[in-house]
């Protein structure tokens, strides 16, 4: 299958701007972009891209991602059309809510409010998609997705055994010396099975889920793609549920989370550090620090904002400055929460930037 045939598919477009699809409003274009409408289309796109030796990546709601200024090579998949939503009432009175990975978190919350289902109120105002929230094990006001997670339907990218002993760099051409298609971890893969993943306590942690990958949005062998999420909720008082949601949204607004484009929290909190990352950053005197149009928010240390036409390079530089200054001040290295995507980001990232 040639790259031309990939482009020719009606659901695939070329050179699609990504800045407008991400909350940071930063980044170049996707070389190829597709929004499959079904699991069949998704599977076909992945397999065709593999045969054509085209790198693959997957983006959720774009609320936690920094796209490289040069854009993203290969085919970027979006599951924004996976928006199914239905419920199952259980014998114990609880309700299982099944939501497609591409459904906006706001739409899921509106559904829960309308049907008086309690358990997700603290996520009111959270940007992004259901799949992205599950992938990150999103945590808001002390409650995480893991607290109500029941199961997720996934597509598994199984590794394909290769005869090659040594594999060349695949970030540029995604193929080995024989032209064999490779996953971005250096091995070929195929999407040969669907799998339902159920809750297991050991698989989850602070901002950690069993779906996460060190490759970020890039697809590779062993990756499980979230197609839909199932959460267990309980019936509640509709007025109280709406009130709780409105309070959380108002609190987010008062904290300036929506004043400028951003990717949310820049760094994860670490209980071992004794203080939230935002406080450590502020104590290092970094509020308002800028690199071009990228700035540490003057009102919140753990928020990097785009004050105008910031570039991904400026954001990455500012992230490095913040980490270095916090280390010099407190002796700890902050862990980045923002996910990097794109060729130059992958090639320039190091453990010190993680």
From Swiss-Prot:
GO terms for biological process: cell division; cell wall organization; peptidoglycan biosynthetic process; regulation of cell shape. Cell wall formation. Keywords: Cell cycle, Cell division, Cell shape, Cell wall biogenesis/degradation, Cytoplasm, FAD, Flavoprotein, NADP, Oxidoreductase, Peptidoglycan synthesis. GO terms for molecular function: FAD binding; UDP-N-acetylmuramate dehydrogenase activity. This is UDP-N-acetylenolpyruvoylglucosamine reductase. NCBIfam families: PRK14648.1. The active site is at 265 (proton donor), 337. One of its GO terms (cellular component) is cytosol. It catalyses: UDP-N-acetyl-alpha-D-muramate + NADP(+) = UDP-N-acetyl-3-O-(1-carboxyvinyl)-alpha-D-glucosamine + NADPH + H(+). Residues 26-236 form the FAD-binding PCMH-type domain. Its cofactor is FAD. It comes from Treponema pallidum (strain Nichols). InterPro entries: FAD-bd_PCMH, FAD-bd_PCMH-like_sf, FAD-bd_PCMH_sub1, FAD-bd_PCMH_sub2, MurB, MurB_C, MurB_C_sf, Oxid_FAD_bind_N.
